[in-house]
Amino acid sequence: MTAAYLPSILVPLVGLIFPALSMALLFIYIEKETIA
């Protein structure tokens, strides 16, 4: 039963949090490279 509404939660979660996380990691990586 939970699988019915799981995609409606998972899609926005992946669509918003994954890009934000990758942006943050990329930003930290660039900052470390710049400082080093």
Swiss-Prot record:
This is Photosystem I reaction center subunit VIII. Pfam families: PSI_8. Coiled coil: none annotated. It is found in: Plastid, Chloroplast thylakoid membrane. Keywords: Chloroplast, Membrane, Photosynthesis, Photosystem I, Plastid, Thylakoid, Transmembrane, Transmembrane helix. Its main location: plastid. May help in the organization of the PsaL subunit. One of its GO terms (biological process) is photosynthesis. Belongs to the PsaI family. SUPFAM superfamilies: Subunit VIII of photosystem I reaction centre, PsaI (SSF81540). One of its GO terms (cellular component) is chloroplast thylakoid membrane. The chain crosses the membrane at residues 9-29. It comes from the Eukaryota. It is a single-pass membrane protein. InterPro entries: PSI_PsaI (IPR001302), PSI_PsaI_sf (IPR036357).
